[in-house]
């Protein structure tokens, strides 16, 4: 699409035998032309959920949800939070010759062998809603709609779930629980949301600390006070929950132990990690190498269903989910910071509202 104000384009290049798709957007500014490029490695294969950073309650909940024969599973977060990558992994788990998986995407970022992928083309009348309506006549078992942007698409997704399809899609919301009032705002009846939603993922991306040059340190009293406030460590049960997560991670042999980083349930945190001041050759002197996800997965339990029908607030629903075992994105980020996989600063950067 081109006009006087902006230009967007896409093309492919090959570097050292690997093919990359580039999406380029330019905008005229006072100093010239501002360009943003999104680079997609077409040789990338879907990562496992564990490789993406799912574990514990989040992993168990989403693995159970995707085995349901019908319903809606949503992935939420801002632009650039890894939603498409999560969807790619989820669809790849389910992909087999025994099921018909069809998608409507804008654009098709990663091609999945054996999956029928359709690209949105507004000029040709192929919108998300129009594409979804067409897919329903193609006898699909599993449907993925790139994004629910309007009431029509939301309604069609719910109706598809009611008629025996497993539907995946995304929403731009701050966390998992706020996806529910967003659907209500789109005009979906509470009882329909309660009966079709299976699980809602909230996620963010954080930079991964370089394992070669990261530095362990003991937080000062002032820093500990700030961390305690930001992560609500002074609230009843929070430190106890961190110790429970440490025991669970140790039993499942997940990541580095956080036991050494934790004091007693009363004393708080003993050890944290930060990026090396000048980085190293392994991370191009940045202190960080790659990115990883932090997640929360809200299960639509019977109690949550009743709250949806009763028009409960997203805060109340979030608290109910946490009481049932869900760990918030902040807690997941904190655990990964205690393991030395990311930093406290990174977790706060992406989870502060």
Go through the PLM ranges and name each one.
Residues 1-353:
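Short, flexible helix-loop junctions that flank or precede catalytic/ligand sites
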């Amino acid at each position: 699409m081109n006009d006087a104000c902006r230009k967007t384009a896409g093309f492919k290049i090959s570097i050292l035998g690997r093919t990359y798709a580039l999406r380029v957007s330019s905008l005229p500014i006072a100093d010239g032309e501002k360009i943003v490029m999104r680079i997609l490695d077409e040789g990338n294969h879907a990562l496992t959920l564990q490789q993406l950073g799912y574990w514990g309650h989040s992993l168990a909940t989403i693995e159970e949800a995707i085995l349901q024969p019908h319903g809606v599973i949503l992935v939420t977060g801002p632009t650039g939070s890894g939603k498409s990558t999560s969807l790619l992994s989820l669809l790849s788990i389910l992909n087999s010759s025994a099921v018909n998986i069809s998608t409507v995407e804008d654009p098709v970022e990663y091609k999945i062998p054996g999956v029928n992928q359709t690209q949105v083309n507004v000029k040709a009348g192929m919108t998300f809603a129009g594409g979804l309506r067409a897919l329903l006549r193609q006898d699909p078992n599993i449907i993925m709609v790139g994004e629910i942007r309007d009431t029509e698409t939301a309604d069609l997704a719910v109706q598809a779930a009611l008629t025996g399809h497993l539907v995946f899609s995304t929403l731009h919301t701050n966390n998992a629980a706020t996806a529910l009032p967003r659907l209500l705002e789109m005009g979906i009846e509470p009882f329909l949301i309660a009966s079709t939603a299976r699980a809602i993922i909230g996620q963010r991306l954080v930079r991964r600390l370089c394992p070669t040059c990261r530095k362990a340190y003991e937080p000062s009293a002032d820093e500990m006070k700030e961390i305690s406030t930001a992560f609500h460590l002074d609230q009843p049960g929070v430190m106890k929950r961190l110790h429970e997560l440490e025991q669970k991670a140790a039993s499942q042999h997940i990541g580095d132990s956080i036991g050494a980083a934790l004091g007693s349930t009363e004393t708080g945190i003993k050890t944290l990690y930060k990026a090396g001041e000048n980085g190293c050759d392994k991370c191009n002197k940045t202190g960080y190498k790659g990115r990883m996800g932090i997640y929360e997965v809200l299960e639509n339990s019977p109690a949550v269903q009743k709250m949806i029908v009763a028009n409960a607030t997203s805060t109340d629903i979030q608290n109910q989910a946490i009481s049932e075992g869900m760990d918030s994105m902040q807690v997941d980020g904190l655990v990964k910071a205690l393991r030395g996989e990311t930093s406290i600063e990174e977790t706060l950067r992406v989870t502060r509202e």
